[in-house]
């Protein structure tokens, strides 16, 4: 037990001075580092690796702070707790930044060459990759920095290569032409996670396709007239009576004069537009599925640069099916070479001239945008590498259905299951250079060789094809492929390591809802496939962060918050963390951030600091250890605060166990600020408290800051180090043991009644306009004067002069204290009488209104409920005012 000398504490708590000093102390001591220890139960979290291009934002605060809280909590429980950090190479995001920088120099990645380009990318990573780590340290995050990994580390790259090769050898990786998300600016495919929908104003164009036999045909509705040049059918719902007579017949595309069939497909929504939709399989995901069901040809008329092109065939098609489509090239020449949106204008103008444009209506639509370049995504057919996911998805789905994998909140398990039930093959190749290059080589005849390295590839090529002349595929793997291996690759897999043996599976994964399918499901699929175990037992889904008005934060709305600029400098890391978590609720997936919670948290730290200064300045000094006096020596106030402390510690423990961080923060604030500082600290100033207060104050503070430490690590450490304590740091201190916190429910109830009476007296002081400096004169039943500490506490907390009177019914809670003050009771009596008359009138009016059956029947439910609420409030005010008048006496 360390007992500090009586310290000279600063008058104010300064996070800007304390937090960097204590964090440096933690780093120097190595307290965040762990080794696998089979003697202790593991608690491990693999940090979702942030992008090296990223800056810390509020989303990081809501996602990573809970991970730090959980790790600190489980470490204090004595578990082998470790939080494993790392960073993601963020292939497309990083490449976008680098290409932009090269453009300023008049260069491209091609002019630089692959090797020189990658060398520059690594230099860029070394220069800027540390920014996110620095931000995390300023937020007080304590992962095991010695174990930090990067998704392009040699060991992780070896794991990625092994998984690709094994999946290929098992027949689950293949090369094929499929519809993909194409970013014309990044010149790469994108995963669904890298595509963001944004609402935009556009038009719905109604275009007439005449019947092949010269009839009226039908009118289709589309928001993308530029792709109609690749239409191969018009689809209608099979039950739509308007078009049943046309099913199986042909209509003719205007301008290019090509006949296409009318087909029936249940995917068509009869209520959308005209109920007839153009089918362009090479440029729309739904159309692609329709095209596959009906075996339609799939010509492409937009190239990889986003420009209209003569029909392109990205797969083998029969000459007979190609011929009529290829023949239209001459008639569409006026549009070829133009950007797709410029071509749209020209096509619409031409349709208008030809009389084929029937209508043009304003329409609000969702456009798919690249999250990296903000370019509009173009669905395109492309030859890419894919994973056949269904054999991997089924075990992952069964793990959830069996209860082996759980989600908090539970509803997100359904999101996970729905994604796996409707899963499609996974496009894993990207046309970028920064990333894990595909372990794929091609012979001069385009035969495929998949191998772990070039030497193996050449050996295989010689054995199979008699030559080792090879060229490597320039593409890299989807970032989510390497991220899917994260929980086991960072533990040394495929090697059998102590870390892998003891720390896999992890206990929890903390992430956001938007990547449940894209990342969580892939970690589960690959973990089960290659390690034979789930990667984690629980997935905790954090809320998305919005502004106070429920709007997404963005620069354009001028509501974006940078915690490193806008929060930490003002409120400190503790205030920022506490403020964020206080607003986090399991029942809501919208965290509508209100900065006032951070300000309140900072003031809370100041409140605790002042309580510490008071405790350390007690004339009787502090005990040599954080131990309590004998029970018989404890006062009523002591017993009350210990009972409340135990309840607080129990609530916080259950909250941490259940990921209810907002509940934990509420309980800590309620106890620390109001129960402890506002009531107990003040109560210790009463006569009769001197003998025990130092020990109780020290014990309560020591216990409380340990319970609060996971959320607010710095102020709790500073307080803990000032008090008598065991160990070198609160980081490794033990979690409060409920068995060591005594509880006195009966005595606590008595003191709770005293607090109720003091609050009544404080309200009376305000009502009667008694100045804070003036003493109140209070009469209490004579029976109270014999109960230890009650009268003295009332006198101290209410600033009252106490006298007694005969009477009372023997119950502290039920006794009414007769109060005499220094106010002008005549004027008060007149004021209360007028207020009672007004309130009686309002009650009568409201009762009459609610008794009117016509009002109740015709008014909305909200209006009736509001009137009932007003009536209840009037009644409460009336009772309170009558009680205040009665308290004045005769």
Regions found by a protein language model. Give the residues of each.
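Catalytic adenosine-cofactor/nucleotide-binding cores of aminoacyl-tRNA synthetases and other
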Residues: 369-373, 545-549, 553-634, 724-726, ...
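Glycine- and acidic
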Residues: 4-9, 48-56, 114-118, 143-150, ...
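N-terminal, positively charged nucleic-acid-binding surface of large information/translation enzymes
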Residues: 2-239, 280-316, 344, 351-396, ...
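C-terminal low-complexity, glycine/proline- and small-hydrophobic-enriched intrinsically disordered tails
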Residues: 722-890
């Amino acid at each position: 037990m360390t007992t500090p000398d009586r310290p000279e504490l600063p008058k104010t708590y300064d996070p800007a001075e304390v937090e960097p000093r204590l964090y440096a102390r933690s780093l120097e001591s190595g307290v965040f580092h762990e080794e696998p220890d089979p003697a202790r139960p593991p608690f491990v979290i693999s940090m979702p690796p942030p992008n090296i291009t990223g800056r810390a934002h509020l989303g990081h605060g809501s996602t990573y702070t809970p991970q730090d809280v959980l790790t600190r909590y489980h470490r204090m429980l004595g578990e082998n707790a470790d939080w494993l950090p790392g960073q993601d190479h963020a292939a497309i995001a990083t490449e976008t930044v680098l290409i932009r920088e090269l453009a300023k120099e008049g260069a491209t990645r091609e002019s630089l060459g692959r090797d020189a380009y990658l060398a520059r990318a690594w230099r860029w990573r070394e220069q800027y990759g540390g920014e996110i780590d620095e931000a995390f340290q300023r937020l007080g995050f304590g992962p095991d920095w010695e174990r930090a990994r990067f998704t392009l580390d040699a060991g992780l790259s070896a794991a990625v290569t092994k998984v690709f090769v094994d999946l290929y050898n098992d027949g689950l990786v293949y090369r094929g032409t499929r519809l993909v998300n194409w970013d014309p600016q990044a010149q790469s495919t994108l995963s669904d996670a890298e595509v963001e929908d944004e609402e935009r104003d556009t038009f719905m164009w109604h275009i007439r396709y005449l019947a092949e036999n010269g009839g009226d045909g039908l009118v289709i509705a589309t928001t993308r007239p530029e792709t109609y040049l690749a239409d191969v059918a018009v689809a209608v719902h099979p039950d739509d009576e308007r078009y049943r007579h046309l099913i199986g017949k042909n209509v003719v595309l205007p301008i290019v004069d090509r006949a296409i069939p009318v087909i029936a497909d249940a995917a068509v929504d009869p209520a959308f537009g005209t109920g007839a939709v153009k089918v362009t399989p090479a440029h729309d995901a739904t159309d692609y599925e329709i095209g596959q069901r009906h075996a339609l040809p799939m010509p492409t008329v937009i190239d990889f640069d986003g420009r209209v092109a003569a029909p392109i065939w990205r797969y083998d098609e029969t000459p007979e099916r190609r011929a009529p489509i290829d023949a239209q090239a001459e008639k569409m020449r006026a549009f070829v070479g133009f950007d797709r949106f410029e071509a749209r204008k020209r096509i619409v103008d031409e349709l208008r001239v030809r009389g084929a444009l029937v209508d043009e209506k304003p329409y609000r639509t969702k456009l798919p945008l690249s999250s990296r370049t903000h370019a509009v995504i173009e669905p395109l057919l492309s030859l890419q590498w894919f994973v056949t996911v269904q054999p991997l998805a089924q075990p992952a789905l069964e793990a959830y259905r069996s209860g082996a994998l759980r989600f908090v909140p539970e509803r997100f398990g359904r999101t996970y299951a729905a994604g796996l039930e409707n899963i499609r093959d996974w496009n894993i190749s990207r046309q970028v250079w920064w990333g894990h290059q595909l372990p794929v080589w091609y012979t001069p005849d385009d035969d495929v060789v998949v191998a772990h390295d070039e030497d193996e590839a050449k050996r295989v090529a010689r054995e199979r094809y008699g030559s080792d002349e090879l060229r490597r595929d320039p593409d890299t793997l989807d970032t989510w492929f390497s991220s899917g291996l994260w929980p086991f690759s960072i533990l040394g897999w495929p090697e059998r390591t102590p870390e892998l043996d003891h720390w896999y599976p992890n206990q929890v994964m903390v992430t956001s809802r938007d990547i449940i399918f894209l990342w969580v499901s892939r970690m589960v699929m690959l973990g089960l496939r290659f390690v034979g175990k789930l990667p984690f037992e629980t997935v905790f889904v954090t809320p998305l962060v919005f502004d106070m008005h429920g709007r997404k934060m963005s620069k354009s709305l001028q509501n974006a918050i940078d915690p490193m600029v806008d929060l930490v400098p003002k409120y400190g890391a503790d205030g920022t963390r506490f403020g964020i978590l206080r607003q986090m609720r399991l029942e809501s997936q919208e965290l509508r951030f209100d900065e006032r919670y951070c300000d309140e948290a900072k003031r809370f730290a100041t409140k605790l600091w002042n309580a510490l200064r008071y405790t350390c300045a007690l004339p009787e000094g502090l005990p040599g250890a954080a131990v309590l006096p004998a029970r018989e020596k404890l006062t009523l106030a002591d017993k009350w605060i210990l009972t409340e402390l135990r309840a607080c510690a129990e609530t916080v423990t259950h909250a941490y166990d259940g990921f209810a961080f907002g509940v934990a923060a509420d309980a800590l604030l309620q106890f620390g600020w109001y129960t402890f500082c506002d009531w107990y600290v003040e109560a210790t100033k009463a006569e009769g408290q001197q003998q025990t207060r130092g020990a109780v104050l020290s014990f309560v503070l020591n216990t409380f800051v340990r319970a609060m430490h996971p959320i607010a690590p710095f102020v709790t450490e500073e307080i803990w180090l000032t008090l008598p304590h065991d160990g070198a740091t609160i980081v490794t201190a033990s979690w409060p043991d409920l068995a060591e916190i005594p509880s006195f429910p009966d005595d606590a109830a008595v003191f709770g009644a005293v607090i109720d009476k003091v609050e009544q007296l404080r309200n009376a002081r305000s009502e009667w306009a008694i100045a804070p400096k003036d003493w109140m004169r209070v009469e209490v039943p004579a029976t109270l004067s014999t109960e230890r500490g009650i009268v003295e506490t009332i006198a101290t907390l209410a600033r009252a002069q106490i006298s007694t009177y005969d009477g009372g019914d023997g119950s502290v809670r039920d006794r009414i204290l007769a109060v005499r003050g220094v106010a002008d009771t005549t004027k008060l009596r007149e004021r209360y009488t007028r207020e009672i008359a007004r309130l009686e009138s309002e009650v009568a009016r409201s009762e009459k209104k609610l008794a009117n059956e016509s009002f109740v029947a015709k008014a909305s439910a909200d209006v009736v409920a509001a009137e009932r609420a007003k009536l209840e409030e009037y009644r409460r005010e009336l009772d309170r005012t009558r009680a205040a008048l009665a308290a004045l006496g005769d």
